[in-house]
Amino acid sequence: MDKFRVQGRTRLSGEVTISGAKNAALPILFAALLAEEPVELQNVPKLKDIDTTIKLLSQLGTKIERNNGSVFVDASAVNEFCAPYDLVKTMRASIWALGPLVARFGQGQVSLPGGCAIGARPVDLHITGLEQLGAEIKLEEGYVKASVNGRLKGAHIVMDKVSVGATVTIMSAATLAEGTTVIENAAREPEIVDTANFLNTLGAKISGAGTDRITIEGVTRLGGGVYRVLPDRIETGTFLVAAAISGGKVVCRQTRPDTLDAVLAKLREAGADIEVGDDWISLDMQGKRPKAITFRTAPHPGFPTDMQAQFSLLNLVAEGTGVITETIFENRFMHVPELIRMGAHAEIESNTVICYGVEQLSGAQVMATDLRASASLVLAGCIAEGVTIVDRIYHIDRGYERIEDKLRALGAKIERVKGE
């Protein structure tokens, strides 16, 4: 397995161009199964999870071509309706194939999924949502099997809890249902809005995305179209933190500041000077150490759980003590023991971590456990004394496009060491 070797004590400064959002590109690629005509998706990042999705869609009979940042999807001749275990096991997002398959073809089956090792992320909300739209669901031999006679039927669905994944599944399936569907307590993330905008480009009638009440008027078919995936707010936040923890200055280009309000507020609280334009953000630490901050993760527009690991690192090298409470996923502090091996001082109590800032971390051999945790370990290596080796970086390749190239452009001394 590949590793990163990072030489530390670097002030990270410069410009970085932000890639398309993984968390929008994935649901949009799966939603393209609903289209009877070809679709062109622009600004699609080159990531492991995207490659897996393309393989899966191809296996279902979709014609797919990649050309730089664009992906051309033609699902007009889909003739397979099963997403098999060997592709699904590495990626939880595969469950998003189920809604479009049953909505358009009346049948679909997906192996129960894999992905990051972050606590329990059950698929039950996806299943109950599809059942409320009239699908019959069976769990057999490790597969979720969905079927319906005729079309799905619109329904009034109140979600038990806010779930990005289940909101995408229900919204996608409801686009081709008969009648109107209302989703109450829907997730409000920018990636949900992007998926809805994509579907509307193809002829869907979705309103209210970005609020907790989404209305979908069913249509009989979706056509083709061209759509540009929104920029990755989590990648943007990660590079802003890189400058914040190293006393540096960074400008993130081709991003969307309006998707990062909670993150920018906390960076300002930590002492960063921040300016924003329509599609750029600049952060200047002016050589200062950040101040520790206290926050809790929450569904959008609250503080994103996908930025929690990076801000844990910020707190661990900040002045003072900060408390972080994780309310979205259990078991999402697996990076903290690794950072403690680098000299950080922290206590974990249930879903809370208390971070006591230290002036300097020391390089060590550490292991990535999930996507965002691995990013925090790489950033820690950039500022630690000495050399840090980050193992199991396949996690990072699932969600960051060419992270080592982008960090090098900011002055990081990082190299990929090929594994056996």
UniProtKB/Swiss-Prot annotation:
GO BP: cell division; cell wall organization; peptidoglycan biosynthetic process; regulation of cell shape; UDP-N-acetylgalactosamine biosynthetic process
Annotated active site: C116 (proton donor)
Catalyzed chemical reaction(s): phosphoenolpyruvate + UDP-N-acetyl-alpha-D-glucosamine = UDP-N-acetyl-3-O-(1-carboxyvinyl)-alpha-D-glucosamine + phosphate
Major site of localization recorded for this protein: cytoplasm
The entry's keywords: Cell cycle, Cell division, Cell shape, Cell wall biogenesis/degradation, Cytoplasm, Peptidoglycan synthesis, Pyruvate, Transferase
Pathway of action: Cell wall biogenesis; peptidoglycan biosynthesis
Binding-site positions, phosphoenolpyruvate: K22, N23
Positions of modified residues (2-(S-cysteinyl)pyruvic acid O-phosphothioketal): C116
Family indicated by similarity: Belongs to the EPSP synthase family. MurA subfamily.
HAMAP family (UniProt xref): MurA
Protein name: UDP-N-acetylglucosamine 1-carboxyvinyltransferase
Originating organism: Yersinia pestis
